[in-house]
């Protein structure tokens, strides 16, 4: 209803101003600005829905100030370009319409009415309401009743008798199991769901809407609200350190806790969270690659679901035979947006909807088949009678190719329980949310029926039942939940541990690199993660007077304030204000101690603009002084005009990447010498080893042969044509996720370059 009212007010404002207001520059500018704000808000809402499926939420607030990287980003480039072009066209059209009768005399009354209607359209828009609520949630002090509803359970289960298998299905919401809406999509897992305790109304609340947040909510009974963006939590050293979570209770009760997934455990800090709360045995892509049958059988995120669930079954067998009480948690990945992935062992590889194949539905149908096969193995085993199996989604599906069809349904998260000791078949329609999952499991295992803000759906009353406005209530509790981190409010002294790559201050520890915004009563950590912008881009968003401490590789800050460190990959500490004074200190000891020293200087806006512009220079445009191309730092020597076909810097150097160009091409600003030696320090990847690799300068070609280890080769070139470009052509680039950023598409690697040097020969 508010959408219609908002649009009606917008339309009325446009029509009244265009046909009645007449000519006046000030009123035109004011009305166009407000109407333009309406357009921007609604396009933001549309774009946010495209990415999150949940309008403008915490994730969007973070994304608006950071880059969106990760799985399938290329899928979103075209829609993003479309939005920008559409916005430009709408603004142009709006200005043209408003000035249609600019030759008529100005009418104050109609101008005022048009402006008021425009303001009303903004105020009535859902986008404005969502942003207002989000901003309020950032500034509230908390809610006085939080302590009354947040309850810590007993730290142990008396006389535990059941083992636990807990399966998180990535984005595998209950909506997919509606056979009328999506016929025969989930027959195997749907049949198992109908055999157990099926909770049909599990809400998704703020702070529970992405994987690590869903895990925290289901195991600790609280949303993931933190003094930093949730997916960046890989940088913290402990996770809600004061809270009692399900894993803590299980460990205290004699359980050995295991977690198995196909992706890297470090992503979003899952390893930190689990280790902080009772899990001593963790298996992710790094741990599994030495034990799986085919370590090369991977998708963009890690190992496919069939591989992961096979390993989970082996672990279940091993632990069951040992007689040791255990919990086994596992997380799938094949249903990750935007398209999902199809395991090769599936029978259900294709699902058509709306008359055409749909990749997301196909991934769901395949993944549920794998999960069902895993559960059926457990059910057929002699250990099932001592086992409780839980299946839940980590969160609702984000924008994937099935999303528009999901949105036509009443959407809920998946949560069902199969008890080997006490078979129960029932669908429970009680209102609940993700935070109730852990409390329900704890209740079944013989523990308390509450956990944080969660309540058992078998014997307690969910917050979703107590509060009709539970989403607003959850946001009101946000400051209280953030305080549970016990995060420091000041930073005066700090220590950098080079062996552990950690920084410590005021009792808190963070992984490096790290950027901190420091004010009188708050220290805001801004870690670097797969989903965040590089720290220098985040720093560029700071205000001129914001105090910062930035710990990163020296070369990343050298171009601003320490050019002598432009080739150093050591740690450096920079602090100051972008509009004031900055200092850079080289970390030259294993345990390096520093102090914050922010001077109250006069702000220089020209200096601020220069710093921001430099911080925003993209990696490939950075230039440094050197007599060779050093590949383990960003940018290139000053003599290089441009280059292509080369991947990002890594600690040792850079790979060629055929996804960025079939050949490595380095163009210099001036012609290369008439006679020179080309000294190449490099290695080959995969089938490129021991193969002739053409290296060309102008019309001359030499052959380079590399092995899998780094070697240095000197090639002799004559350059009579004054060519200025060096070309290297890897013979057989290999598509691989080796060393890739989690969630990115595979790279096509050919050669790994450490250094290339041009040495002029006499004569």
Curated annotation (Swiss-Prot):
It is found in: Cell inner membrane. Pathway: Glycan metabolism; osmoregulated periplasmic glucan (OPG) biosynthesis. Keywords: Cell inner membrane, Cell membrane, Membrane, Transferase, Transmembrane, Transmembrane helix. GO terms for molecular function: phosphatidylglycerol-membrane-oligosaccharide glycerophosphotransferase activity. Pfam families: DUF7024, Sulfatase. GO terms for biological process: glucan biosynthetic process. CDD domains: LTA_synthase. It is a multi-pass membrane protein. Its main location: membrane. It catalyses: a phosphatidylglycerol + a membrane-derived-oligosaccharide D-glucose = a 1,2-diacyl-sn-glycerol + a membrane-derived-oligosaccharide 6-(glycerophospho)-D-glucose. Belongs to the OpgB family. Transfers a phosphoglycerol residue from phosphatidylglycerol to the membrane-bound nascent glucan backbones. This is Phosphoglycerol transferase I. It comes from Escherichia coli (strain SE11). The gene is mdoB.
